[in-house]
């Protein structure tokens, strides 16, 4: 099912992202950190080295993630998208997922800011599920993050982006309080397999505050 004409959330004024450096700026000032930095704070040196090892090149996770995020963004907006055929096993399974059947798009690749914590972030999608007999604006609102994995077996092993979704949720609640998120989802996209992990927004929010506390303990005192 194609989405109807989207009623998108207005972007946050004066908030920008430099994609090359992955740094956010708000009202002309660079923000000190991103959600990804805070979440990545818990990684061991071995985990960081492993991520770096498989990041680069035409088949690295950075290229894969960018390509598949782009396809999903175009699908959510109801736009055609040209992509390399090598990503078809990922894309076919992803777009077959029932979550992306009948929905109304509220936002995708949406930039957020937490001014108090000098932090930026951006979520992948916010949709309202369309259900028979449910009036527009009364459907389940789903906040989602897309993760890609290299192998089919990795789909089952991938953990949900619980704290990350909690960060987006807390910023969204502050910036757009009328939006009531019913469910947070991590969509795990692998070749020929896709999995949606659904979580309660309150659990995500609690996981985020825990992650922030751990990160904050290591911040230098001024």
Where are these regions (language model features)?
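Metal-dependent nuclease catalytic cores that hydrolyze phosphodiester bonds in DNA/RNA
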Residues: 1-120
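Mg2+/Mn2+-dependent nuclease catalytic core
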Residues: 110-222
